[in-house]
């Protein structure tokens, strides 16, 4: 039963690590929601875990940001559960090393053991520990309701792509499949990649990233 796993997960996020303001409650619920995915992965395998977290996206409403306003005792959107879990899953993909991701979670719980923290402290810890600047990723998924859109087009042997529907400076790397797996680093400006000639319909973005795609 997922609720048993979820509430057990709060021993780490929401009990051991607790936010100073309920505006940052996404830290409690996002990471605890993701404990359900970790449990599913341990019991049934990685693809089952991926299926689980991706399956929760249909419950995300994007009605308001998952970070609430500070100093007024107000939470963010209830999306903090499923969107928060998908944010953590996306971060895991970008780190691209499950051992490092596991060490990050354990290190976070050692560093902030039995403390009250801010969401910003958690964000900065993840960036510093991973060696990857996640600031724009957090700005996008925590403080807006927009889901990034990767626009792309193929002409001859060139694939062009860019991010839209995103915060200024959004530069999240992305794994794609177009005649094989590749990593690209889109920005809001068009970039071009030389490829073998192929049908645009064979292009796909890795489903584990919480994004939308739009062929042009």
Where are the language model's segments positioned?
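Amphipathic alpha-helical substructures
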Residues: 77-159
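Short, solvent-exposed loop/turn segments at the edges of secondary structure
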Residues: 27-29, 61, 82-86
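Edge beta-strands of extracellular beta-sandwich domains
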Residues: 206-216
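Zinc-dependent metallopeptidase catalytic helix centered on the HExxH motif
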Residues: 1-50
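Active-site-adjacent structural elements in folded domains
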Residues: 67-76, 109
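Beta-strand-rich binding/interaction modules
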Residues: 134-135, 150, 154-207
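Short helix/loop segments within enzyme catalytic domains
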Residues: 39-61, 100-103
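Active-site-adjacent bridging/hinge elements
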Residues: 6-11, 56-69
């Amino acid at each position: 039963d997922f609720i048993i796993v979820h509430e057990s997960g709060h021993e780490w996020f929401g009990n051991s690590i607790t936010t100073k303001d309920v505006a940052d409650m996404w830290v409690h619920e996002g990471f605890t929601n993701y404990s359900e995915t970790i449990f599913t992965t341990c019991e049934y395998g990685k693809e089952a875990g991926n299926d689980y977290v991706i399956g929760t996206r249909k419950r995300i409403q994007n009605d308001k940001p998952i970070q609430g306003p500070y100093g007024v005792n107000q939470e963010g959107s209830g999306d903090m559960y499923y969107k928060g879990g998908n944010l953590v899953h996306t971060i895991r993909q970008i780190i691209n090393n499950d051992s490092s991701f596991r060490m990050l979670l354990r290190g976070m719980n050692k560093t902030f053991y039995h403390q009250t923290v801010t969401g910003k402290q958690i964000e900065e810890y993840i960036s510093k520990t991973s060696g990857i600047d996640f600031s724009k990723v957090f700005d996008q998924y925590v403080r807006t309701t927009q889901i990034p859109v990767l626009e792309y087009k193929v002409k001859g042997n060139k694939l062009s792509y860019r991010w839209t529907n995103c915060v200024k400076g959004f530069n999240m790397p992305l794994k794609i499949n177009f005649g094989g797996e590749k990593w690209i680093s889109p920005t809001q400006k068009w970039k071009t990649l030389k490829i073998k000639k192929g049908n645009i319909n064979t292009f796909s973005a890795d489903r584990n990233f919480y994004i939308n795609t739009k062929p042009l």
